Amino acid sequence: DMEITDETVIYESKILDSHPLKYYIIHKPSGYVCANKDPHDPCLITLLPDDNLHYVGRLDRDTTGLVILTNDLKLRKRLTLPEFHIPRTYAFTCLNPLKDITSFKEGITIDGDVKCLPAIVEMTSEYEGVITLEEGRYHEIKKMFLSLNNKITSLHRIMYGDISLGDLE
C-alpha cells in the first residue's frame, strides 16, 4: 500500500522519500539574474543554501526587490498563472514626467499587438510612482512605458500578492 503526498512517499508504513517544502523571500540586488545558470551575470539562487528551488516571478538584471523561491510547485503555479489574478506591485522612477495614467487602466499595447491587462498606477511625484499589475510578461512594465514615449530608470518590486519585503534589505 503506497501513499504519496506533496512532501512524502510512504510505502508499507515506511517513509521512502521526504521533501519538506521550502520557501524563501529574498531582496534581489541589482546585477543578479533570476536564473539557475548564466554565463555572464551572477545568479540570485547562488545566494541561498539550496539550489533545488524555482523562481516565482523573475526580475530583470537591473530590477531590484522581492523574489520568492520555493520547491512548492503548486504554490508557484498558483502565484504565477494570470488566471489566479495575483497582483505584483512595483515602485518605479521614469525618465520623463508621467502625465497619462489612464492608459494603464485601459491596458497598454506592447510589441505591436500584445494588449496588457489593466494596471493601476499611483504617482508619488512627477517622475515616481507605484504600479500594480496581475501578469508578468517579459519586460512588461518597461515596454508599457516605452509605448508611452517614456522610460523606466528604476524598478523595484515591493509586493507579490500579500507578501511584502518588510524590513529585508
In which residue ranges do the predicted regions lie?
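Basic, flexible Lys/Arg- and Gly-enriched helix-loop patches that mediate nucleic-acid binding at interfaces
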Residues: 1-169
